[in-house]
Amino acid sequence: AIAANTKRVRVGPAIVNPYTTNPAEIAMAIVTLDELSAGRAVLGIGAGAPEFLSWIGLQSRHPLTRVKDTVQILRNLIADRRTAFEGNEFGRWTQQAYLRFKPIRGKIPIYIGAHGFKMLELIGEIGDGGLPSLFPPEFATRAIESISIGARRADRDVREIDISGCVWFSLSNDTDMAKEALRELIAYYGPHLAPVMIEEIGLNTADFDPIEDAIRRSDFETAKALVTERMMRLAIFGSPEQCIQRLEELEKTGVTQVNIGPPLGPRPEEAIETIGSKIIQYFLGNK
């Protein structure tokens, strides 16, 4: 629907994991979307969360290798290279493993989702772009450092890699309402965030134990109520002016664009309009 009703915006999934979806299926889906959007598709690949995968009986084995092999397979398929591939994660693919139609582009940008240091380095090594999880935004500096390490290892210039930082975002002139919209998200995902990320704002995993206990009891209202002011800093929230200030701080770290994630605000549609009319226009005017 987005592809059919737009002409300039890039479209694509962020982020698909190669445990629940085979690379061949991912390739067929993304080249179809690329054709529907007249060459505007982008693809995000990430290892997914081990605990969430375990809920459906899957084990997150060798995530780094699996993502790396997935990217290689996808590039072969999209470029219509009929070459055999053999790896530890997906076994042996013969030359018969190719798309039975020619994609309109031989290359679709592949962005790698990451929060751990090794996966962040992989962005620098092989990614056309990166989708680092910045929960909180203060993690950006360390994320960029890791991406740069990977880029140097592959003899690449990190400035050529599009780093699209993923942030939680809640926009409202009423700061209390903006924070209230964040409570459920932080309560649900906060206990699963990497310690190296949350320590940037003085949190540790034990801080989320009471929330996790409440969720296990299906006591979601208590879980939301236990979200603290410090935990709110995992996200960007507040008025347009407050959000712009934090986005400017993020820009200084080397992030090239921002992937604005949920909840957007207490009134999501209104927030989208304000992001377009005020926040995006502000940054366009300062270029």
Where are these regions (language model features)?
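Active-site-adjacent structural elements that line small-molecule/cofactor binding pockets in enzymes
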Residues: 1-287
